[in-house]
């Protein structure tokens, strides 16, 4: 009976312990990788989720009070803690909404006959009287910190250059007003009791000697053809830049152009429904028209046939006619209250009704929102009601992220990414489609360039090249992968892009001449006598091919201008421009070449290993049965290695999709939806790298960048999973070879 020696039993036990430890370590590593991927996914989702949460409106406080006089307007400070009310006697009252007390009041004018205000970002009010005069007032708040406490001090300031302006020389009572007023200019328009439309333009001129501003009031001359029914005028507004005046009648909307103290009628639009009132949307690039049937439509200028026209873009319908409306100060949101007491929060650009609920049983007299849009202040017959509004990301929806949106100033709906701009009234545009398109565009052109070269090189190196030459070629190509992509991107942007621009015909010609010349050289080599072919060792054909390709490249770059003169009138870029094809110096062609050079080592290494690893008995058996080398390659070797070759291409695609520095430095980084190889793009990865440092933590922009990262993560995961599934299928299919 045989017994194991003690030292052998010890070694078996030791081996068992090592196997157990390694098994646990391998399993733990696999589970850890999966857990890490899931944590990344969950973290991205946690940052993204708030942009798709529902809007909430919660009651915050109430202050019961009744006012004997009609309310003309209400407003508040930036945080919605103190409000003001202007009544038809010309008095303004300031109310502390926290302590529910009257803070102060001031008489601005006695019994005004007309009233208006500028957009909320200007905070100017105008009062008309029975003598044809207009008086201005600016209402605001001063913040004072006393002993660590924040105190709001109400302010009412007059327009110092003009205590009042005589708009009507005939001293007729004013019935309607429209106002636009800034620090350097302004326009006041008024209708009179005798049915006239009058206007005064306010201009400030700086005295070069004293540096003081001198204001002038200049009457505006109106074209009389459009002023035949002022008695039926319902509403009028002026844009803050003093360029346009909108007049609303029951079934007509007029657009007037103001220039050089003159006003002429630009266009008149017939309205099918009966209109009520005009309101400027935030930024004053759009005008909102209220209708008697409870609908609200947005209009803005578009250019059609090189002519600017006011166009109805979108319409919102409500359950009852609108009684109060308040646009947000900095966003395209609007608070709407109808006759039934329903509150609706809408975002005009995304065409979303964010919130709709019945909240009011009493008549609503006025509504306003502070600049931060975090509160809603409503004045009813019974007093003040304040609501907390949670609506941090109204501009984001599935449609705005993945669909076409019609933005102000654009002729039609489009996919647009533009997160920031220099002006305050800019509207962020967060469509990810241009970035996703740019990502796929860059990856596509990179694979078009790198795929044939890398796979062809892998086939030749693994199957045809001699082992002595392969020993030097393969490590040389593989070491290219260690080259930093920032260096490749720098060379592409600074060195390669100008070369391509100055030799565009030569570059395109080489894409045809190189493959054609290789086939011609191969054909000539094939028909040469056998004794000549035997002089060159097997697998060293590149010794002849490389000088030939270098010579063709030299001739093409030096004499490509002849082709350009013959076919393209001497300038290919100008010729393409005449055909409507744009050209950017840093374009997809440059990116394709540069990124292709970066992913060639990845594709080559995996594909070459797959081809070289095909069992020798398969190829030798095929050759022994009479097949040629080419037949053996195409019918045996490539089929067996196809799973590895496919994996190589997918790895190259994943590398191209996630590449950042090359795209960042070799393109113009313009988010375009254009497949033109001669124009640039912006990719998801490059966009994250560019904009993440400048985004505010927790802002819509910040979360949209995380959404872009999540899409990149999902796309890469999907491509890799699909590649693995196809690879396994190919492996099972050709296992029997």
Whereabouts are the PLM-identified features?
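Interhelical loop and adjacent transmembrane-helix boundary motif
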Residues: 579-581, 663-713
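Transmembrane alpha-helices
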Residues: 604-606, 614, 629-664
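Repeated scaffold domains used in trafficking and secretory/extracellular systems
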Residues: 68-76, 110-123, 162-180, 226-240, ...
